[in-house]
Regions:
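Residues that recognize and position ribonucleotide moieties
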Residues: 7-8, 46
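Generic recognition of well-ordered alpha-helical segments
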Residues: 16, 34-37
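A short, surface-exposed loop/turn module that caps and links secondary-structure elements
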Residues: 37-64
Length: 93
């Protein structure tokens, strides 16, 4: 039985981060795309040093895009959705 894929949604901050990432670290965009594909199937496990972040409420995780940039996202299991919070630099609240 195939599980349902998580829908990826971007916060306004994450949309800005994607623009910055494509300008300043275009090689990282390809890696980010692969991470997002993986997150659609299994958001809590996989590549990129998956880590649940303790300083946030709920299911907030991070994955390494590069040594300089982290992908931070919140998982909403009840609606099968992942909200990307940031994708440029390190953690932001």
């Amino acid at each position: 039985m195939k599980t349902e894929m998580y829908r990826i949604v971007f916060s306004n901050d994450a949309k800005k981060d994607l623009k910055e990432l494509s300008k300043k670290a275009p090689q990282a965009v390809k890696k980010l795309s692969k991470l997002l594909e993986e997150i659609q199937e299994h958001p809590r496990t996989g590549t990129g040093q998956v880590e649940r972040l303790k300083g946030y409420d709920g299911n907030v995780y991070s994955r390494r895009i590069t040594h300089e940039h982290k992908l931070v996202y919140r998982i909403y299991d009840e609606v099968i959705e992942v909200l990307v919070l940031s994708a440029f630099g390190h953690y932001k609240k």
